[in-house]
């Protein structure tokens, strides 16, 4: 079992239940899913860019990414409907907890000039969004094997109803927020 799942059951759940005065354990917010998205606008010109990004994302997430396609044609961006423009992975259950643990304890300390993540990136419903500028912070990515530095968006979806509940949940996992 993932260690963060054990931490959630033994430490985070009782702490949140006491802090927010929940009557039942099922009311305590929990993680639903983590979505990792790589938007690749330049993939329309070269298919190898998309393949390399998929390979990187598969190494990071431990799961095969799905290709995202353009919903509408946009002349300004020089894309047509149905063209591949990125890739994403949705993590749930054990893989989600394992990724979050690696992200919190291994990857985020490797970010240059890291002082913590902004607590303002909650969406009003307890979900947290953050962007990463380079995939090199993950130990699975070898610096010599990448063709270019790519960023990604990470969305942490929770069952929390408010931002305060969502922040308390992520802090319970040891998520590094700026003070």
From Swiss-Prot:
PROSITE patterns found in the cross-reference section: RIBOSOMAL_L5
Keyword Ribonucleoprotein applies: yes
Highest taxon of source: Bacteria
Pfam families, per database record: Ribosomal_L5, Ribosomal_L5_C
HAMAP family: Ribosomal_uL5_B
Family: Belongs to the universal ribosomal protein uL5 family.
Oligomer and partners: Part of the 50S ribosomal subunit; part of the 5S rRNA/L5/L18/L25 subcomplex. Contacts the 5S rRNA and the P site tRNA. Forms a bridge to the 30S subunit in the 70S ribosome.
Protein name: Large ribosomal subunit protein uL5
Gene that produces this protein: rplE
């Amino acid at each position: 079992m993932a260690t963060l799942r054990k931490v959630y059951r033994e430490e985070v759940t009782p702490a949140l239940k006491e802090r927010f005065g929940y009557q039942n354990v099922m009311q305590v917010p929990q993680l639903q899913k983590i979505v990792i998205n790589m938007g690749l606008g330049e993939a329309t010109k070269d298919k190898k860019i998309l393949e390399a990004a998929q390979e990187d994302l598969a190494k990071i997430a431990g799961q095969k990414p799905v290709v995202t396609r353009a919903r509408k044609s946009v002349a300004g961006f020089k894309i047509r409907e149905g063209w591949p423009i990125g890739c994403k992975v949705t993590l749930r259950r054990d893989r989600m907890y394992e990724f979050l643990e690696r992200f919190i304890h291994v990857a985020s300390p490797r970010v240059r000039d890291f002082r913590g993540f902004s607590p303002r990136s909650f969406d009003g419903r307890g979900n947290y969004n953050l962007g990463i500028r380079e995939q090199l912070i993950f130990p699975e990515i070898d610096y010599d094997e990448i063709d270019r530095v790519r960023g990604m968006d990470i969305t942490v979806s929770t069952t929390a109803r408010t931002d305060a509940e969502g922040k308390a949940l992520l802090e319970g996992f040891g998520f590094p927020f700026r003070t």
